[in-house]
C-alpha cells in the first residue's frame, strides 16, 4: 500500500510553522518525548500571564481549574468522572509506584494474591516487584499473555477470592508492538491459566501507547491506567496521571505514607492518629500538586486539536503508522552487493495494521559479512547527519533480551565485561548489547524517514564485493621509512577550538599534559560547555600564545584579536573578575573563572551565538582522571592524545575519492587535523601504536591509557566546520564496528622542567600477552 498523506496541505503548513526549529533537523525520538509546538508555548504563557494562580490549598479558583483539567483529560480518553478517578502524579513511573505501594493483595491473615507482570515491560514495572506486598511475584511471557485471548471461560472455575494485579503495556516501548486491549476485560473476567484463585485487576502502562494512539476507556476498561503527558504534548514534563476505575478504588488502601492535604485530621502526638480524605485523588496526591503544569494542560489539549482537527488521535495514529511502515519497508529492502541484509529488524508484526503496531521501528545495522555494527557508531553517524534517534535497550530489558536472543547469562557476562545501561559499550564479542530505535510523531515528515534511510544507505551499504585488507595485508603493503619520530605538537588552549601548532623547538609539560592545553572553554548562557558537536564553526577560532597571554583570532574579526591573560581571568587591560562558574566536562563538574564581558562579547560575535562566556579552568578544584587519579585539564578522557600520521595515511587510502560527500579528498595534514591529537608521530608501519603499552618520546616516558573511541567530531573539516560522513564510516568498517583511532597517554615519572622536543625519537613498548 502506498503512503497516503493524512494531513491536508494547510494542516501540514501549520504544523511546519509551529515547528520551525525542525527546518534542518530530523527528530526521530518521539517515543522518548513528543515535541511541543511554538503556538502551544505561547498559549501556555498567555494562560499563566493572564491570571493569578494560587496554591490550590489556598484558592478555590485553582481547585476548580484543576477539576476542569481532570474532566478534560478524562474526556480525552473517552471516559467521565463517574467511571474513572484521575490522580495526578509526576509521571508514569510515579503512577506505577503508587499502584505498587497501595494495592491490597488481600487481608493480612489470608494467602495474598499474585503480582504478575509482562517480561517485555519497562524497568519501572520491574521496580514494582520491590514494593508489592505479596511474595507471589511472577513474570509472564508475551505468548502466555496473548493466550488469554483464546482462553474460553471455564464455568467450573472456582470463585476467585485473592485480589491480584497484572501489569502489561498497551504498546511496547521497545518496538511499538500493541497488545490487544480486549485482554483487560478478558483477564479480569476469566483470569490467567495457572492462577485459579486469583481475581486479577489489570494495570495498563499506557505511556508509549497514548503518545500517538487513541485510548478509549469507554470501550476498554482496565482497573488502572498509567501515563505521562509529555509523551503526548512534549510539555509539561514532570506530570503524569493514574486513572483508577471507580470500582477498583477500594483496592488502593495499602499506602502508608500521607502528605499535606491528604488527611482530614492528623495528630502530632505519639498515638499517630490520622484520618485520610474520602476522594481518591485527595487521599493519594501528597502535598501541593504541580498545579501550574496541570493548568498548562488546557492549552496543550486545545493546541493539538486545533492543529489536527477531527478525531485528533485517530488521525495522528494513521499518520505516524504510515511513516513507521514506510521506514520499516525501506530499511527492510536495503541489501549489500552480496545480497546480504543491511538491517536486522526487531519486530513482532509486519506493519500490517495500526491496531497491532505503533509508530516505532527498531533495528541494528549489519555489515556485508553479517556482523553487527554497534549502535553507538550508528548514533554517531546519525548525529553527523542531523538525525536525533535513540539507542540502547530503552529501559525495556525483557524485550531487548528476547529480540537480541540474549540469555540471562549473556546479560550478566556483558555486565561483568563493563556494560551498564546507557553506556556506549555496544558490542561484546561481536554480540550487540542494544539496538537503534526511531519513532515518529505528528510533526514528523516523510522526508525525515527518507533522510534516515539515505544515511543508512550511504554509510553502511557496501556496493562493491571487494573486501577490506587483513591486518597482515596492511603491514605487508607498507614499507619502512625512518625511525619513528615526533613530527608535530598541537595544543588546544580553548576546548574544541582550533589548534596551536608548535613548529620549532618544543613545548613544556605540565601536570595535566601539555602546558595550557584545554585550559579554557566556552559555555552557553546556561553554563553548558560548547563543543564542535553543537557548534562546528568553533574550529575557526585560532589561538596563539605570546608573552604569557592567549591571543584568539577569527577570520570574521581579523582586526579584533582577543587577548587574555593565561593566569588571570580577564582580557588585557580589563580587571580580572574572580567570578567562579560551574560547568560539566564529560560528566565531571568543573569550576571555571569567567574571563569578563569583553571576552564574552568577542566569542559570541565570532561564533554568532548570543550569551556565550569564556572560562578559564580554576585551580581550586583540580579535575582527576577516574581510573588513575591523574590531573586533567578540560580534555575529555586523558592527558594526551597520540595520532600516527602513517595510520592516517593508511586510513585515507581506504576512503574512496568519491566518498567525501562531493568534496575533494582532504590532504593528509587536513585529515590529521580532524583527529585533534596532541602528539603527532610518524612510525614505520600503520596502526602499530595500537599495540603499545608505554611510549618513550626523547627523555619523557608515557603510559598508554587505551585507545581513543572516536565520535562525529572527526567528520568535521577543521578548516571550514563542514561535516562529512568520513572518515568515521571507514574506521567502523575497517575495525569491525569499533570506532577507535589513536591512543591516550598519561605522563609517567617526573615531568618537572621537562619539554617535549620536536623531532624526538619515539619508542613504543609492547607487553606481550601470555
UniProtKB/Swiss-Prot annotation:
It is an enzyme of class 2 (transferase). Keywords: Molybdenum cofactor biosynthesis, Pyridoxal phosphate, Transferase. Residues 601-770 form the MOSC domain. Its cofactor is pyridoxal 5'-phosphate. The gene is mal. It catalyses: Mo-molybdopterin + L-cysteine + AH2 = thio-Mo-molybdopterin + L-alanine + A + H2O. This is Molybdenum cofactor sulfurase. The active site is at 395. InterPro entries: Aminotrans_V_dom (IPR000192), MoCF_Sase_C (IPR005302), MoCo_sulfurase (IPR028886), MOCOS_middle (IPR005303), PyrdxlP-dep_Trfase (IPR015424), PyrdxlP-dep_Trfase_major (IPR015421), PyrdxlP-dep_Trfase_small (IPR015422), Pyrv_Knase-like_insert_dom_sf (IPR011037). The modification N6-(pyridoxal phosphate)lysine is found at residue 231. One of its GO terms (molecular function) is molybdenum cofactor sulfurtransferase activity. Belongs to the class-V pyridoxal-phosphate-dependent aminotransferase family. MOCOS subfamily. PROSITE patterns: MOSC (PS51340). Sulfurates the molybdenum cofactor. Sulfation of molybdenum is essential for xanthine dehydrogenase (XDH) and aldehyde oxidase (ADO) enzymes in which molybdenum cofactor is liganded by 1 oxygen and 1 sulfur atom in active form. It holds the Pfam family MOSC_N. Its EC number is 2.8.1.9. One of its GO terms (biological process) is Mo-molybdopterin cofactor biosynthetic process.
Amino acid at each position: 500500500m502506498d503512503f497516503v498523506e493524512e494531513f491536508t496541505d494547510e494542516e501540514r503548513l501549520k504544523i511546519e510553522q509551529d515547528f520551525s526549529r525542525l527546518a534542518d533537523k530530523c527528530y526521530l525520538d518521539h517515543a522518548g518525548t513528543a515535541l511541543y509546538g511554538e503556538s502551544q508555548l505561547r498559549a501556555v504563557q498567555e494562560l499563566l500571564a493572564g491570571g493569578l494562580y494560587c496554591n490550590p490549598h489556598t484558592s478555590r479558583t485553582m481547585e476548580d481549574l484543576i477539576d476542569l483539567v481532570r474532566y478534560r483529560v478524562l474526556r480525552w480518553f473517552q471516559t467521565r468522572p463517574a467511571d474513572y478517578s484521575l490522580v495526578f502524579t509526576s509521571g508514569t513511573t510515579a503512577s506505577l509506584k503508587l499502584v505498587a505501594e497501595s494495592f491490597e493483595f488481600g487481608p493480612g491473615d489470608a494467602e495474598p494474591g499474585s503480582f504478575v507482570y509482562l517480561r517485555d515491560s519497562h524497568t519501572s514495572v520491574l521496580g514494582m516487584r520491590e514494593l508489592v506486598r505479596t511474595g507471589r511475584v511472577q513474570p509472564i511471557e508475551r505468548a502466555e499473555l496473548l493466550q488469554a485471548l483464546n482462553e474460553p471461560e471455564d464455568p467450573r472455575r472456582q470463585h476467585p477470592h485473592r485480589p491480584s494485579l497484572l501489569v502489561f503495556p498497551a504498546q511496547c516501548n521497545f518496538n511499538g508492538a500493541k497488545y490487544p486491549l480486549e485482554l483487560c476485560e478478558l483477564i479480569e473476567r476469566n483470569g490467567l491459566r495457572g492462577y485459579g484463585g486469583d481475581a486479577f485487576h489489570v494495570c495498563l502502562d499506557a505511556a508509549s501507547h497514548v503518545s500517538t494512539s487513541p485510548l478509549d476507556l469507554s470501550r476498554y476498561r482496565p482497573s488502572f491506567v498509567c501515563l505521562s503527558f509529555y509523551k503526548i504534548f512534549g510539555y509539561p514534563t514532570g506530570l503524569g496521571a493514574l486513572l483508577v476505575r471507580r470500582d477498583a478504588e477500594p483496592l488502593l488502601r495499602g499506602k502508608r505514607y500521607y502528605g499535606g492535604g491528604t488527611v482530614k485530621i492528623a495528630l502530632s502526638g505519639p498515638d499517630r492518629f490520622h484520618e485520610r480524605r474520602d476522594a481518591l485523588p485527595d487521599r493519594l496526591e501528597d502535598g501541593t500538586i504541580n498545579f501550574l503544569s496541570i493548568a498548562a494542560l488546557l492549552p496543550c489539549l486545545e493546541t493539538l486539536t486545533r492543529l489536527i482537527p477531527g478525531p485528533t488521535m485517530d488521525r495522528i495514529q494513521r499518520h505516524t503508522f504510515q511513516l513507521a511502515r514506510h521506514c520499516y519497508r525501506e530499511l527492510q529492502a536495503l541489501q549489500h552487493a552480496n545480497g546480504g541484509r543491511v538491517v536486522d529488524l526487531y519486530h513482532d508484526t509486519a506493519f500490517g495494521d495500526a491496531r497491532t503496531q505503533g509508530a516505532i521501528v527498531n533495528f541494528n545495522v549489519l555489515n556485508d559479512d553479517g556482523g553487527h555494527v554497534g549502535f553507538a557508531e550508528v548514533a554517531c553517524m546519525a548525529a553527523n547527519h542531523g538525525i536525533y534517534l535513540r539507542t540502547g535497550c530503552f529501559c525495556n530489558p525483557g524485550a531487548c533480551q528476547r529480540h537480541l536472543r540474549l540469555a540471562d547469562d549473556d546479560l550478566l557476562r556483558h555486565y561483568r565485561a563493563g556494560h551498564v545501561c546507557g553506556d556506549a559499550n555496544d558490542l561484546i564479542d561481536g554480540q550487540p548489547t542494544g539496538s537503534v530505535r526511531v519513532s515518529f510523531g505528528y510533526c514528523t515528515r516523510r522526508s525525515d524517514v527518507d533522510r534516515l534511510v539515505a544515511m543508512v544507505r550511504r554509510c553502511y551499504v557496501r556496493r562493491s564485493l571487494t573486501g577490506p585488507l587483513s591486518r597482515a595485508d596492511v603491514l605487508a603493503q607498507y614499507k619502512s621509512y625512518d625511525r619513528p619520530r615526533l613530527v608535530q605538537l598541537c595544543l588546544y588552549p580553548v576546548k574544541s577550538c582550533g589548534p596551536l601548532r608548535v613548529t620549532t623547538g618544543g613545548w613544556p609539560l605540565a601536570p595535566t599534559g601539555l602546558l595550557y592545553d584545554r585550559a579554557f572553554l566556552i559555555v552557553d548562557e546556561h553554563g553548558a560547555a560548547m563543543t564542535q558537536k553543537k557548534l562546528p564553526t568553533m574550529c575557526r577560532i585560532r589561538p596563539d600564545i605570546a608573552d604569557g597571554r592567549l591571543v584568539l583570532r577569527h577570520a570574521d574579526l581579523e582586526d579584533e584579536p582577543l587577548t587574555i591573560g593565561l593566569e588571570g581571568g580577564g582580557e588585557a587591560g580589563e580587571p580580572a573578575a574572580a567570578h567562579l562558574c560551574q560547568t560539566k566536562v564529560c560528566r565531571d563538574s568543573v569550576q571555571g573563572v569567567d574571563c569578563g564581558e569583553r571576552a564574552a562579547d568577542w566569542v559570541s560575535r565570532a561564533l554568532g551565538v548570543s550569551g556565550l562566556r569564556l572560562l578559564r579552568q580554576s585551580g581550586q578544584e583540580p579535575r582527576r582522571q577516574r581510573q588513575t587519579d591523574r590531573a586533567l585539564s578540560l580534555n575529555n578522557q586523558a592527558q594526551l592524545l597520540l595520532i600516527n600520521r602513517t595510520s592516517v595515511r593508511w586510513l585515507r587510502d581506504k576512503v574512496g575519492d568519491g566518498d567525501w560527500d562531493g568534496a575533494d579528498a582532504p590532504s593528509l595534514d587536513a585529515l590529521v587535523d580532524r583527529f585533534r591529537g596532541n602528539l603527532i608521530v610518524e612510525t614505520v608501519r600503520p596502526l602499530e601504536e595500537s599495540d603499545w603499552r608505554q611510549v618513550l618520546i626523547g627523555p619523557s616516558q608515557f603510559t598508554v591509557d587505551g585507545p581513543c573511541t572516536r565520535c562525529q567530531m572527526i567528520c568535521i573539516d577543521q578548516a571550514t566546520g563542514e561535516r562529512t560522513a568520513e572518515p568515521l564510516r571507514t574506521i567502523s568498517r575497517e575495525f569491525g564496528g569499533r570506532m577507535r583511532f589513536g591512543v591516550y597517554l598519561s605522563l609517567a615519572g617526573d615531568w618537572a622542567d621537562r619539554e617535549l622536543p620536536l623531532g624526538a625519537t619515539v619508542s613504543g613498548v609492547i607487553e606481550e600477552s601470555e
